Design a protein with these regions (language model features):
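Non-catalytic terminal extensions that flank enzyme cores
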Residues: 2-67, 90, 347, 360, ...
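Feature 926 captures the class I aminoacyl-tRNA synthetase adenylation module centered on the KMSKS loop
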Residues: 3-7, 215, 407-467, 471, ...
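Residue patterns forming the tRNA-binding/recognition surfaces of aminoacyl-tRNA synthetases
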Residues: 9, 16, 21, 30, ...
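N-terminal catalytic cores of NTP/NDP-binding nucleotidyl/phosphoryl-transfer enzymes
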Residues: 45-107, 169, 229-231, 236, ...
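Alpha-helical support elements that line or immediately flank enzyme active sites
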Residues: 69-71, 294-299, 507-517, 651
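Conserved phosphate/anionic-ligand binding catalytic regions in large, soluble enzymes, centered on
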Residues: 70, 227-245, 359-361, 367, ...
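Extended active-site and interfacial segments that coordinate phosphate-rich ligands
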Residues: 70-78, 227-263, 286-293, 303-309, ...
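Secondary-structure transition/capping motifs at alpha-helix termini
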Residues: 81-89, 110-123, 143, 147-152, ...
């Protein structure tokens, strides 16, 4: 064994062992400042050193840390700290998103308090106010991410609208425009009448609202009769350009090709057949309004229908709506229903719950609206992005999400990239009023390059926020320049993100990177799920079940929150977070604190130069060293597979159960005994194992591990840069581990039987063990002291495996042996009988109460299924417990 530990500040041993009480708040700020001041998170590009890089998904500049951020950041930080300790050349590049509509709405609300609108200020003055707001409030989320312990290289922080990113955005836009992949066109988009801008799908929140399904008759144009349609949106009737039925619907086959008179207008519209129509919905006959419904728009394209826009951008009706011109859309709805009723065309209405889209920023009901927008042609870009995943260049973890990704790209539509906002990357296109030239330019223009006219104006729209985000893996590293950072760390190693933005962000980064870098943006896409509450419900304001991560950090510490977010977590699946779990992990941190305190209190005479010979290790020493080596292997293997939850569970089990609960108890006798050599060996093992636990746990719980490691004997300036612990093959003891495990099984059996018999904790007992293996028999004979210290066993009698079993004893079967606890003289049988009889009487009342409930027909009829199931489960448990009481009483009668 050639590993040495150097006691930092050995003259201050008293100060080092005086850890005091564990107070997370007292240590977290201290160590984060230490890491930043010492440049721990910063690496320079180093040729010949293996790179590892992650770009932080940029939170909105308006953002407050929520549980989704906390999970996302924790998973990334674990990977980054792990690779940093493994000696990789690491970059974790942070940044913030300008969050177009979210930020603009914030500032609009701010100036509204002054009685102003953005139009009162004008574009330039309004943007000045937005930049002021960004400078004042935009760093909040960064400070909160720091509180979580995220070890980002803040010296390289980027902003989606800084000069570096802005240059990349212009280069990409103009390049795509020059290739014919960006165009202007009239298409249907999500439209917010209040914000007066197109919205991406992710900016639309769907809520189930109770509305109505109205039934109307549309008269046939050339004969008697009518077709009956059902709609949730009567206000769009003036924009109808067809009525559609399913071609398989025999009820309407004879009507296909005929025409109907469109109520409220003087137009006639055709009856068409399209497979999209659901024969079971309403009457199976639907009105088609291509300008105001995305499915109708697609049908309109298939059948070459006219697109008639009947609404203004503020949600009022326009002149194409006839007499309803100028009305609000909902006022128009009422008027149309009234008018069709007067015409005798209203049939009936039914209450119907349906999903209604709302603007995520102002909560206005979104209007599907056909407007002139800028689009990216997606089909040519989708191919290379699909091939990158199909060929395995980029892998999804879990792999099942690759099919989700491919399926979306196979059915991709052109991407609407323009937004009618002021805050954002302004579209770099200019129009010449004199010659009509349309120019896309990488730099601002002052004159038309074709005719020289100065009568030019820039397109007023800005780009979708996701446009700049799609360039994030390479724009943040200085592209289009080939910077040293880009050369070293692109492509990035891993993208960590939720499954909810695979389409909005992951796919877009893929196709932009394949187009402009001719290379994948990341090698792995590590997908995580959502954070849910204790009942598995999504956290939301309406349910009031959200947990504020900053409140959790204040109360329990960042380490406890981080460990909660990762333990039990599996890739791609949702996880549950609630205060009881966080408190449990705060207790784990406290357990480590106390174990370190115990170790430090016994290091007064510690010699860092002492290295034990193998013969000096006890069975318990060898057991814990082998357990450590196995844990080191399991943790590394699981981290490499992105099974971060399994890695955390492995450390938890070893640190709490093996080291704290078992090994420290075996160590006490040797530390306090008369033999100095025993004390030295035990000190060595305690320090060796504990410091390596700190290293293994550091990526998960960075603050407490750094603090404790700094107090323990160590070498190096910071645990964050200490070598990652790899299993030492010179300290492998699998045989001894198996022997100690069998002894522990026997001791656990003794403890369980003592508890079952209600034996006083300090009372020594006698046991008999029937052993089935000679090596185990010898092992028990030479290690009886473990039974004495850990099981309060005064005497052990070893029996032949086929010998007579003792009477009046409790028995337990464990691997390779049977263990018997002799009860005679160990317990007061009369008192024990009285205790069980009392417990039995109380249990009989519970059984009667629960049985009464389950025999009550009213309860069974009214109670929810899960409540009834719980009562049945409870009754089964009670009855099982009653059986065990009866068995115990029979046993006591024989003593």
């Amino acid at each position: 064994m050639k590993e040495f530990f150097y006691l930092q500040g050995v003259d201050d041993m008293d100060e080092m062992k005086d850890l005091g009480k564990y107070e997370p708040g007292a240590i977290e700020e201290k160590w984060y400042n230490f890491w930043e001041e010492h440049g721990v998170f910063h690496d320079e590009p180093e040729e010949g050193k293996e790179p590892y890089s992650i770009v932080l998904p940029p939170p909105n500049v308006t953002g407050q840390l929520h549980m989704g951020h906390a999970l996302d950041n924790t998973l990334q930080d674990i990977l980054i700290r792990y690779k940093r300790m493994q000696g990789y050349n690491v970059l974790w590049l942070p940044g913030k998103d300008h969050a177009g509509i979210a930020t603009q709405v914030k500032v609009e609300k701010q100036i509204a308090e002054e009685g102003l609108t953005k139009y009162d200020l004008g574009r330039e003055k309004f943007l000045e106010r937005v930049w002021e707001w960004k400078e004042k409030y935009g760093n909040t989320i960064g400070k909160q991410i720091r509180r979580l312990g995220s070890s980002c290289d803040w010296s390289r922080e980027r902003f989606t609208m800084d000069d570096v990113c802005a240059r990349a955005v212009r280069e990409v836009f103009v390049s795509l425009y020059e290739k014919g992949l960006i165009y202007q066109g009239f298409r249907i988009t999500n439209w917010c009448p209040r914000c007066q801008t197109a919205l991406s799908d992710i900016e639309v929140e769907h809520e189930n609202d109770m509305g109505h399904l109205w039934y109307f008759d549309y008269p046939l144009a050339d004969e008697e009769g009518a077709v009956r349609i059902a709609t949730t949106r009567p206000e769009t009737i003036p924009g109808d350009t067809a009525v559609a039925v399913n071609p398989k619907d025999e009820r309407y086959a004879h009507l296909v090709g005929k025409r109907v008179k469109l109520p409220t207008t003087d137009r006639e519209i055709p009856i068409i057949a399209d497979e999209y129509v659901d024969m079971e919905y309403g009457t199976g006959c639907v009105k088609i309004t291509p300008a105001h419904d995305p499915n109708d728009f697609a049908m309109g394209e298939r059948h070459h229908l006219e697109t008639i826009v009947i609404m203004n951008k503020d949600g009022t009706m326009n002149e194409k709506a006839g007499r309803y011109n100028g009305m609000d859309r909902y006022e128009c709805r009422k008027e149309i229903i009234k008018d069709l009723t007067d015409m005798g065309l209203f049939v009936k209405s039914e209450e119907k719950e349906h999903a209604v889209g709302h603007c995520s920023r102002c909560h206005t009901v979104v209007e599907p609206l056909t407007t002139k927008q800028w689009f990216v042609k997606m089909k040519p870009l989708a191919g290379p992005a699909m091939e990158a995943v199909q060929s395995g260049k980029t892998k999804f973890v879990p792999e099942r999400f690759s099919s989700t990704y491919i399926q979306w790209l196979e059915n991709i539509h052109d991407w609407c990239i323009s937004r009618q906002l002021w805050w954002g990357h302004r579209i770099p296109v200019w129009y010449c009023d004199d010659c009509g030239e349309v120019i896309a330019s990488r730099t601002d223009l002052e004159a038309c390059p074709k005719c020289g006219s100065k009568h030019i104006r820039q397109d007023p729209d800005v780009l979708d926020t996701w446009f700049s985000s799609a360039l994030w893996p390479f724009s943040t590293m200085g592209w289009p320049d080939r910077t040293p950072v880009l050369n070293q760390w692109y492509p990035t190693s891993t993208m960590v993100t939720g499954y909810d933005i695979i389409f909005f962000w992951v796919a877009r980064m893929m196709f932009m990177s394949m187009e402009f870098m001719k290379e994948i943006p990341f090698r792995y896409v590590f997908i995580h799920g959502l954070v849910r509450d204790s009942q598995g419900r999504k956290m939301s304001k309406s349910l009031g079940n959200g947990i504020d991560p900053l409140e959790v950090i204040e109360k329990y510490g960042a380490d406890a929150l981080r460990f909660t977010l990762v333990t039990g977590n599996t890739p791609g699946n949702d996880m549950r977070c609630y205060y009881e779990r966080v408190e449990g992990n705060r207790n784990f941190a406290n357990k480590l604190w106390n174990a370190s305190k115990f170790t430090l209190m016994n290091l007064d005479d510690y010699d860092p130069r002492f290295i034990p010979e193998e013969s000096q290790y006890t069975l318990a020493d060898k057991w814990i060293l082998e357990g450590l080596a196995q844990t080191e292997e399991h943790v590394s293997e699981n981290l490499d597979k992105y099974e971060l939850g399994a890695a955390a569970d492995s450390i938890y089990d070893f640190a709490w159960n093996s080291f704290c609960d078992w090994y420290i108890e075996t160590a006490k006798g040797r530390l306090y005994g008369a033999h100095n050599a025993d004390r030295q060996v035990t000190q060595y093992v305690l320090v060796y194992v504990l410091t390596r636990i700190m290293a293994l746990l550091h990526p998960f719980m960075p603050f407490i591990t750094e603090h404790l490691w700094q107090h323990l004997p160590h070498s190096g300036e910071t645990l964050a840069r200490a070598p990652w612990p790899a299993a030492d093959e010179r300290l492998r003891f699998p045989e001894e581990q198996e022997q100690m495990e069998r002894i522990m099984d026997a001791i656990k059996a003794v403890r369980n039987m003592r508890a079952e018999a209600n034996v006083a904790p300090n009372k020594m007992c006698h046991i008999r063990i029937a052993v089935h293996r000679d090596d185990l028999k010898k092992c028990i004979e030479t290690h009886e002291e473990y039974f004495e210290k850990l099981g309060h066993v005064e005497k052990i009698v070893l029996l032949a495996a086929d010998g007579t079993k003792p009477e009046n004893a409790l028995a337990a079967v464990v691997t390779g042996m049977e263990v018997y606890l002799e009860l005679k003289g160990l317990i007061d049988t009369a008192k024990e009988r009285e205790r069980i009889e009392k417990a039995k009487a109380a249990l009989e009342k519970e059984i009667a109460r629960t049985s009464g409930k389950l025999n009550n027909k009213g309860f069974l009829a009214k109670a929810p299924e899960d409540v009834v199931a719980k009562e049945k489960e409870k009754l089964a448990e009670f009855e099982e417990k009653m059986k065990s009481f009866d068995e115990r009483l029979r046993f006591l009668a024989d003593l």
